[in-house]
């Protein structure tokens, strides 16, 4: 048997390492970029054939090809492999095929899925279960096969789910779905279908917790599992309270909107799994939200600074804006072919001033109209402009609405740069 890897990112690297120890086969790695010396050495030491700098028809000799999640469906090699009948799969699918589906908790959504995944891991671990945290978040799922766990909590991206043939799992949570990654998916429908794929594979004994608003995007009648919606009369959250199964619980802190949605969604799932919420609320007290997600940095001259660098869609930006009255907003990065006219219409009541830089400024600028706005070159200039147009008591929010790759390695590097500038300007950190 010959196993191929189309792309050699984190997930395929972990899968190859696992297969080298557990399966007799020939392996072939095809990477569009140049492989580093350490990677080449590893492949050569394990007699793994490879190519770099592009993909060739050598992949056609493989019985199965594992696709790196980021590779687009319209890639010419994908089209060639499909036309020749070569089986395509993913590291995630391999994991799901080799684990008890009742132990898997899969979480997806356009915004908030990393935080919700981390929260689910936190409460399960706090309850005493040996829990694995991974998937699109951190560690590739296949690495969990080297150990024994009570639960596997996985963040699942639309890319992973698109390429996975049959991602079946017993516990599935969808936080929200809005337009995103339309630069990757051929349509919004394809994006929605990818996100919801596991739900339509579930059976009667499984659990599907989802945002009620999803019903406007896709008919869920074909889902056979137990369907529990939130943002309903029975399951919702206010600034102070959590309502689950119609019963009120006091939240143990003040949380921004997106975090309240995460707490609500995970609490509904937790209630369905364990039939009580008291332990969840106690464990919630100790949960530390992830950085770069509505992270309050502190003050400079009475101005309040928030780092929301993880917000890479306009839906996420609107969620951030909902926490404030008037905001000096910094947007940047690479847009995702969203409806910017609609975004500006919804955002404008919240905007004192909009500051833009990077690729997204070209897409946004035609729609900003009479909103006070500035286009600058980089984060340094954006920070200076924000100080200039703001006054004591104002909120200055970095919530980019675009991917980071035009100017930064990732969203975390972008957020760290914003924090670094904040410190350099004498920011009083909390």
Curated annotation (Swiss-Prot):
Its recorded name reads UDP-N-acetylmuramoylalanine--D-glutamate ligase
Q: Which residues form a coiled coil?
A: none
Which InterPro entries does the UniProt entry name for this protein? Mur-like_cat_sf, Mur_ligase_C, Mur_ligase_C_dom_sf, Mur_ligase_cen, MurD
Single GO biological process annotation from the record: peptidoglycan biosynthetic process
Pathway per its UniProt entry is: Cell wall biogenesis; peptidoglycan biosynthesis
State any GO CC term. Answer: cytoplasm
Provide the family line: Belongs to the MurCDEF family.
Name its cellular compartments: Cytoplasm
Q: Which HAMAP family match?
A: MurD
User: What EC number(s) does its UniProt record assign?
Assistant: 6.3.2.9
Citing just one GO molecular function, the answer is: UDP-N-acetylmuramoylalanine-D-glutamate ligase activity
Detail the disulphide connectivity of this chain as listed in its UniProt entry: none
Q: Does the keyword Cell cycle apply?
A: yes
The record lists ATP as bound by 109-115
The record ties this protein, via PANTHER family, to: UDP-N-ACETYLMURAMOYLALANINE--D-GLUTAMATE LIGASE
Designated gene of the protein? murD
Provide the catalytic activity annotation.
UDP-N-acetyl-alpha-D-muramoyl-L-alanine + D-glutamate + ATP = UDP-N-acetyl-alpha-D-muramoyl-L-alanyl-D-glutamate + ADP + phosphate + H(+)
Keyword ATP-binding (UniProt): yes
Q: What is the lineage of its organism?
A: Bacteria, Thermotogati, Thermotogota, Thermotogae, Thermotogales
Q: Which SUPFAM superfamilies match?
A: MurCD N-terminal domain, MurD-like peptide ligases, catalytic domain, MurD-like peptide ligases, peptide-binding domain
Q: What top-tier enzyme class does this entry carry?
A: ligase
What this chain does, per the entry, is described as: Cell wall formation. Catalyzes the addition of glutamate to the nucleotide precursor UDP-N-acetylmuramoyl-L-alanine (UMA).
What keywords would UniProt list here? ATP-binding, Cell cycle, Cell division, Cell shape, Cell wall biogenesis/degradation, Cytoplasm, Ligase, Nucleotide-binding, Peptidoglycan synthesis
- What's the source species for this entry? Thermotoga maritima (strain ATCC 43589 / DSM 3109 / JCM 10099 / NBRC 100826 / MSB8)
